[in-house]
């Protein structure tokens, strides 16, 4: 961009895709987006779930459109499943039987994990017993298809990783500095419109199962608005959830990406010259 090349910022954050979550997802402001096209920010209504496959299909279209007009698409975000689906493709898992899905999601988490340990022990060993989303997904696939999720994941198709020139960069800030920023961010959101954002979501009476209703900050603020949590308790809970997510992202970025992807560790500032050298610009 400094050299005058047109660019397009493509969102790769699973919360920033929702129009309903401008504040709680820390979506870039109009001022921050001025002058450079930003796409897939606030592109989905909260009533419609944006799956990794949905996002990857939209991202492929935006990347192709950018290339067609000679612009550089820059993916920004830390949702690992989105990025891996775009690059590697998607597993052709058959449609899950709705009754199976309903039964699995109605199970106590402990019971679901115990069943997964018996039916797909390899997958169960890789998951934390509290990882409700991944446990229920693995179990519903096993029940509905008769095969473990790993079987389907070995048959990925549709990825663009081999068709584009990648210049990846992983930013790894000092962990305690990052956690302090997480805590501060949630407090600023609380006073900067997050309450009104959640009130508007609750007024829509959307199902709790939708991703927009499970986004960090929404359950905590909803509990405060219902009178189930005090202000301080809701803020502390939201801060803890944010730190937990940052920790999971940190682990994923360190261990799940190709080893040759450059990583930049820093304390509280970013050296743009070093970034340029890492990206081989």
Curated annotation (Swiss-Prot):
Q: Does the keyword tRNA processing apply?
A: yes
Report whether Magnesium shows up as a keyword of the record.
Answer: yes
Catalyzes what?
Answer: adenosine(37) in tRNA + dimethylallyl diphosphate = N(6)-dimethylallyladenosine(37) in tRNA + diphosphate
Task: Supply the EC number(s).
Answer: 2.5.1.75
- One of the record's GO molecular function terms: ATP binding
Q: Note the site residues: Interaction with substrate tRNA.
A: 79, 101
Q: Which UniProt keywords apply?
A: ATP-binding, Magnesium, Nucleotide-binding, Transferase, tRNA processing
One GO biological process term is: tRNA modification
Q: Mind telling me which Pfam families this protein's record contains?
A: IPPT
Detail the disulphide connectivity of this chain as listed in its UniProt entry.
none
Names of the cofactor(s): Mg(2+)
Q: Where is this region: Interaction with substrate tRNA?
A: 13-16, 133-137
Biological role stated in the UniProt entry = Catalyzes the transfer of a dimethylallyl group onto the adenine at position 37 in tRNAs that read codons beginning with uridine, leading to the formation of N6-(dimethylallyl)adenosine (i(6)A).
Q: Return the HAMAP family for the record.
A: IPP_trans
Q: Which family does it belong to?
A: Belongs to the IPP transferase family.
Listed under subunit, the entry gives: Monomer.
Protein name in the entry: tRNA dimethylallyltransferase
